[in-house]
Amino acid sequence: MIRLLILLLLLNFYSCIEKDIKESNFVGYLVANDSIKIPFDFVFKDSLITISNSKENIKLIRSVDQHDSIKFVSPYFEDYLLFHNHFDSLSGYLHNKSLDRKVKFFALRGENKVVNHENFLLIEGKWKIIFNYDKSESRESEMIISQNKNKIQGTFRTETGDYGFMQGFVGKNKFNLSNFNGYRANLVEAKVYGDTIFGVLYQGNHNVKKFIGFRDDSFNLPDPYAITSMTPGYEKFLFSFRDIEGKIVHNFDKKFLNKVNIIQIMGTWCPNCLDESIYLKSIKEKYKDVVIVSIAFEFAKSKEQAIENLIKLKKNIGIDYDILLAQYGSSDKIDAANKLKSIDTLISYPTLFITDKNLKVRRIHTGFNGPATGEKYTQFKRDFENFLTQLINE
C-alpha cells in the first residue's frame, strides 16, 4: 500500500511538471563559449515550442522522446533540441548530425527582464558594417535598426542574404541583438562610440566575427543581379538531376519549353533559401504559367538523409514544384559549380536564374534578403514581379 502511494505521488509530480511546462515562458540559451550565451525567448504550449524573434514566431514540434529526454524538431531544418526537464529549468543540446555539430543548451523558466535605462543610446537607422575588418577577407554588410526606447529590432543585410529577425536592448554605450530559428543562432554584442561601432558576432559555437560600423544612410550593397555570371558561350541554364522520387529531370523537358522558368539553387540547411522558397511558393500560386524548379546541394552525409530533408521541407512549406538533388555530403560551392556547367562561379546559396520562354537566362539573382529587411524586401518583390510579368508578356 505504501509503495502504491509513493508511486501515485511520483506519477502526479511528473504529470504536474509535464502539464506546467506546456504553458510556460522560458528564456533559452545556446552556449557559444564559456562566457558567451546566445539568448532567445520561447513558450511551451500544446507540444510546441514557439520562439520569438522580433516580428517572427518560429515553431519547433515535439517528436518522439528519447529515454528521459524531450525532443523538439524544426519543421524545415535537420536540427533538433534534445533536453532534460528539471521543472524550473531545462538542459541539453542542439544537435545537427550531418554537420557533426552539438551546441550546449539550457533554459530558465520566466521572461527576459532587462532594466529600462533612462539614458539609452539612439541607434535607429542604417549602419555600414565591415565584418572581419582586421583580416584580409573582410566583408561589408548593412545593419538596419528600429528602436522603441531601449528595445531594438533589426537585421544585417549582406550580398548573399540577411541574418533574419533579431531583437535586443540598447544601454548607455552598448547594445545586443540575437535570434534563433531552430538552426541558426546569432548574437551581436557591440559598443558605440559616437557614430562608430565596435562589436562581435557569435554564430552558434562555431563562428566568431569582429566588426566595425559607421552611420551611413547612403551605403548600398552590390547589385544582386550583377554578382553571378553565366559561363562564356552559355545562354541557357543546363541541368539534369533526379527529383526526390528518383526521376531524372532536365532543362529541355517539355514542361519547361515555351514557359518562363525560375531555377533556384538551394539547400535545406540554408535559412535564406527557406525564406526564398516560401516566397517562390507565393509566386507559383500567383503566376500559374511560370515553371519553378529547385536544385539542392545538401550537407546530409547520405542520399537517404538528403532526400528525407527535401521531402520534409517540401511538405511543410507546401511546395508543388520539383526539387532535384544535385549533391549530398557537401555544399562546397566549387564542387557545386562543377556540376552546373552553365555558370562561371557559384557565389551564394540561394541563387535564382530567370529564363524567358526560349530558355535563355535573362537575369541571375544572387542571395536573398527576405522579410526581416523590411522595405528592401518589399522593393525586391515589386521589381522581381514586374520583370516576371514583362517576360510572361513577351
Q: What feature does the model see in each segment?
A:
Residues 1, 10-23:
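Bacterial Sec-dependent signal peptides at the C-terminal "C-region" and cleavage site
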Residues 23-85, 118-189:
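Central antiparallel beta-sheet cores of small beta-barrel/beta-sandwich binding domains
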